[in-house]
């Protein structure tokens, strides 16, 4: 990376030349002595080296977690909450450094990491600090002499496998509730974006007892599979594509442990004709909602990658929507004016370009974009794709398969019934958007769409206290909200008799 570009943001280079695994509160070289280069999508060039871990490293991390789990589970909820709040404070104090680290690792614009990813991470830690302080058990009076007590107890040691699209935020989504609930964690980041979590551990590691959080890097089959299939974890949480999620579920089933899976999506974004009833702030907001397919370079599981426009307004709406897309500024991710950055990897770049080619072969009309964006200078080797809009129909593969890039496929509908049918004609059910000035219609559509989250007159908001998760092949379980504590705890029932008298059966 160009150090001058980083310095302009008021921070030094967040990365060292080489990292180790973070195990038991210390930096530990991989047992096999192997490393791999991590490449920044900004230029397509390596910027650091991280461990290529294997079974021995997974075992070492599990050893450290098990050594810490009893003491951490006994730590009072007050102290755990205080630690989570201190983590939030430390992240906030180093927000710019971590935002730059995330942009270098993932390729997303620094304006997003600064304004969204890292502030959300801060808020999630604070939210779960509050949740665990407020959590209560239960008492049931069976009769005058018999009481049932219900306690929330941690699962113990949990495995977490993090995706490459939001490396720090998705790690936070899993770490915050797991730690609040009293669990120890072994976490494996995606091999495409392995480095920003290591910078985070440099920043917050001293706030946690050794072994409570352990980070091992490596590839899926070499490190992820041994972790997910280990009989020494009590749960596995995974965010990623649906095909890998099936494998994670199979691994977990061998040990009969619970899973949380947040998987793929093909989210509909539905615009009813009344959005054009006036050319006002609401319509402007709806146009932004259409353009949200390009947020994070389209690398979002809930990317609104299917746009459904009521046919009575299609031409007028699309004229304005395409102008909005054309105004999206693509450029250097460390430029604070950049609105869309680079795809996370060369592999993902090629996948997106192959789907763009497929769309044309299927007969879809490319309305804008539709190609790689080759930028100047050092950025020429980066992984950039122009925001792309296709027009077609819902049976096309570009409407049915997850592309995970800045590509939206647009079609029309006649009425509410057809809109709902098209929206639900998918294997997935993670997110959806509904845009209308009619509150009753918004409610009907929200209840009728088969998705875990339906944004209504908004899109891509991810507050800590709103449950997130999928229907159908988009996953199992929920993330965020206080209900997430239930995913990382088990219930202990003490059924106590205070009567001195025998039951009288024997």
UniProtKB/Swiss-Prot annotation:
Highest taxon listed in the record's lineage: Bacteria
Catalyzed reactions: an aldehyde + NAD(+) + H2O = a carboxylate + NADH + 2 H(+)
Keyword list, A-Z: Acetoin catabolism, NAD, Oxidoreductase
Residues in the signal sequence: none
Record EC number: 1.2.1.3
GO biological process terms on file: acetoin catabolic process; ethanol catabolic process
Amino-acid positions noted as binding NAD(+) in the UniProt annotation, renumbered to this chain: 240-245
Pfam families: Aldedh
Pathway(s) served: Alcohol metabolism; ethanol degradation; acetate from ethanol: step 2/2; Ketone degradation; acetoin degradation
Any one GO molecular function term: aldehyde dehydrogenase (NAD+) activity
Gene3D superfamilies in alphabetical order: Aldehyde Dehydrogenase, Chain A, domain 1, Aldehyde Dehydrogenase, Chain A, domain 2
Similarity remark: Belongs to the aldehyde dehydrogenase family.
Functional summary from the UniProt entry: Involved in the catabolism of acetoin and ethanol.
Name by which UniProt lists this protein: Acetaldehyde dehydrogenase 2
Organism: Cupriavidus necator (strain ATCC 17699 / DSM 428 / KCTC 22496 / NCIMB 10442 / H16 / Stanier 337)
